[in-house]
């Protein structure tokens, strides 16, 4: 009996769904709780004002509900068991949204310097004696003591920051892919991004819905996003 009482009877009874969201689901074709149960997360996310985060919450509340015996009989008449078996056998994987394989337009010299930067191991430049005292952080500070072995450059005492460790000027500060990073907070920030040489990095404070809009707009403009959202998609069998 407790399971029956926990089962949402109306769309507005679902966790995270109010009257306005229920109307949006109904307009998208999900007029009952059964329709929501049969839908995928991606299908629910396409409804106006739902998004991936709320779609996942809805599926968590509705997707695991047990189906009554009468409903099973009706589904068997329609042939729904075959569809359920098919859904259970579908393989999925996480894939990044957007143009993840896009590379920048670099000159031969920039490509050579970028490869050189990858092959050179830069020291960590830890603070002197950081491993001896717990209160000493690893952040770099130049040793100033007259007897400091690190200041005198004694082997094994750690490297000191010098100009010779800097990366080549042409590729300094660039992403490992070769793009110049541009921090964006909304779709308007993408207006000044050059898709051939620059890539967007979405700010960490941006929410899921706005992030999705930014990623869609960036893909339409041919701009690569360096920190894309990973979504679950079905794996197509090419055999």
UniProtKB/Swiss-Prot annotation:
Pfam families: HHH_5, Ribosomal_L32e. InterPro entries: DNA_repair_Rad51/TF_NusA_a-hlx (IPR010995), Hlx-hairpin-Hlx_DNA-bd_motif (IPR003583), Ribosomal_eL32 (IPR001515), Ribosomal_eL32_arc (IPR023654), Ribosomal_eL32_CS (IPR018263), Ribosomal_eL32_sf (IPR036351). Residues 130-155 have a biased composition (Basic residues). One of its GO terms (cellular component) is cytosolic large ribosomal subunit. Disulfide bonds: none annotated. The keyword Membrane does not apply. It comes from the Archaea. Residues 1-12, 67-91 have a biased composition (Acidic residues). GO terms for biological process: DNA repair; translation. Residues 1-23, 64-178 are annotated as: Disordered. SUPFAM superfamilies: Rad51 N-terminal domain-like (SSF47794), Ribosomal protein L32e (SSF52042). Residues 92-113 have a biased composition (Basic and acidic residues). Keywords: Ribonucleoprotein, Ribosomal protein. GO terms for molecular function: DNA binding; nucleotide binding; structural constituent of ribosome. Belongs to the eukaryotic ribosomal protein eL32 family. This is Large ribosomal subunit protein eL32. The lineage of its organism: Archaea, Methanobacteriati, Methanobacteriota, Stenosarchaea group, Halobacteria. The gene is rpl32e.
